[in-house]
Amino acid sequence: MIISMDQFGAKPEQGFDNTLAVMSALEYCREIEGAELVFPQGRYHFWPDKAAEKQLFISNHDQEGLRRIAFQLTDHNGITIDGQGSEFIFHGPMIPFVIDHCRNATIRNIVIDWENPMFAQGTVIRADDDSFDLQLPEGTNYKIENDGVWFNFGGKTEKVWGLNEFDPRTKAPAYQSGDRISWGNYRKVRIEESRPGVITYRGKNIQLPQIGNVIVMRFSRRENPAFFVNGGENVILDSINIHHAPGMGLLAQWCRNIRLHKFNVMRRPGSDRMVTATADATHFVFCRGQITIDQCLLENQLDDPCNVHGIYARITEKLGEDQLMVELAHGMSKGIKIAEPGDLIEFVRRDSLLPYANLRAKNVKVLNKDYIIVTFDQPLPDDVHIHDVIGNRSSNPDLTVTHSTVRANRARGFLITTAGSVLLEHNKISTPGAGIKISGDANYWFESGDVKQVMIRNNEFMDCNYCCPDWGRAVIDIDPEIENPEAYEQCYHRNISIENNRFVTFDVGIVSGHSVDGIRFVNNVIETSDSYPPHHVMKYPIELKACKNVTISDNQWPNDSKAIGLVNDSEIKIT
C-alpha cells in the first residue's frame, strides 16, 4: 500500500518543521503491514523541538540519556520509506532514523544533511617557530574564553578539544598529520585571538600544519548517528547519501541481516566542508546473520569507514558456582545488551585474549548500564579470574563488502573482528591509516573478537597508511592487543587470506601481524608510487611474529631481488 506524505501535511519548505507530520505518518503505517511511505521529491527540514524523545543506549556513542528522533520506526513490519531523491535537512542534536526491532524494513532514495554541522574549519595562514594562525570563514560565530575556542551547536556551546589537518588538494588528512594536534597534545597549546576571525595557537614542540591547509576543529564527539538500527531483522538501506552526521553514519546493534546498497557517506558536491560524519561511517555491534555492503562510497568521516565487532564484558565478581557479575568497562559501551538466554558465552583471558571455556547463558539480568549478572547452564570453570572477560560467540555475523570505495577519512579502513565468514572483494581503499585492521582487545575499547575465515581478494590499496604509525604500521595490520604473543602456543586469529590484490604504495610496509594461525599472501601485485615520502616505520614489506602456517608465494614485487620478509624473527626470501 502506497501512502504519500502529502496526506499528513509534510511540506518541502524552508522553515517548516516536518517532524510532527512524520510522527503521524509512522503511527499510521505501523498498523499496515507492507506500507510504503513516499515523499514527493523536495527539501524537507526537521528540528528537535517537537521530536519524539527516548532513552537509547547506542554503542560507541556518547551515552548522554534522552535523544530526540525524527523518524522513529518501532516494531514496524515490512515498511518502506522512499524519499524519491528528497533531501532531509536536520537542525541541532537529533537522530534522523531509529529503526527499532523492525522486520523487513527498507529506507531508500534520500539525502541526509545538517544545516549547520557539528564541527568548524579554517585555513592556516601562518606557521612558524612554535605557533600558527588559523583564519575562520567570514561570519563564523565563535568565542574565546578560558583558554578555549567555543562554538554553538543546536543551542549548546561546545569547546574545541582537537584539530585535524586536511590537504585541500586531496580533500584528505594531510601527510603525517594524524591526531598530533588533538587529545593531550591539544591541551598543551595556548590560544588567543590575534584579530577578529584569526586564532593563534602557541605551544612548544607542537606539530605545525602547512600554510594553506584546512584545519577541522572538533567539538563534542559522537552525539547521534544518522541511522540507529536496534534489533530486528532484514533491514535494507538503499541509495542513501549522508553528507553529515554528528556521530556515525550508521550504528547497527543486535540486528540480524542488514544490507547497505549505494549507502554513501560522502561530501556534498561543491561543498567546502571537509568532514562528513564525526565518527565512523558504518559500525556493527553484536549483529547476527549477514552484513552486506555493496557499491558504497565512505569518505571524509572522522573515524573508520566500517567496524564489525562484539563487546567483551569484564568479570568483576563470582556470585555463585554458576553465576558472574560482569561490567561494561568502556564509557561508550554502557547499557548495551551483551547476551540473551541460550547464547554461547566464551571465557577469555585478559592478557592473552585466548579462550579457556564455553558455557550457555541461562539468564541475563541487567542491574544498570554498568553491571550485568549472568547465570549459566553449568558450573563456572574452576580457574575463572576476576578481570578476565566474556564474549558472545552467538553474535558473529558474516560480512561481505564488494565494489565499494573508502577514502580520505581520519584513521583506518575496515576494522574486522567477527568469527563469521568475511569477504572483501573488488573494493578501492585509500586511507591515512591501515587499509584493513584486524585486532581485538580486552583493555580499552573491549571490542571482541577473533576472526576465523577472512578473504581479502581482488581489491586495490592506494597509498594507504600515510599517517603512520598513528593508525597502523602497514597497509594490512593484524594486531590483537596481546602484550607478549610469543609466550603462547595458541594463536588468537585464524585463516586470513590476502589474494590477487593490487598494492600501490610509497612505503615498505604491506602486512604487519601477530598471533595468526593460517595466513596466506598469494598472487598480489605490489607497485611503488611517489605520492608521499616514505616513513620507514617498517623495514620489511611483510613482518609477522607468533604466527603459524604462513604462505607467501607468487607475488609480484617491485624489485624481486630485495623481497625479504621477517617471519617469526627470521629473514626469509619472499616471492
Where are each of the predicted segments found?
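Solenoid scaffold repeats with emphasis on beta-solenoid/beta-helix
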Residues: 3, 35-37, 71, 79, ...
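N-terminal extracellular ligand-recognition/capping segment immediately after the signal peptide
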Residues: 7-9, 19-26, 32-79, 84-98, ...
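Low-complexity, polar/charged sequence tracts that form flexible coils or short amphipathic helices
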Residues: 89-91, 98-100, 219-220, 228-233, ...
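Ser/Thr/Gly-rich low-complexity blocks that favor extended beta-strand/coil architectures
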Residues: 90, 114-116, 137-191, 334-369
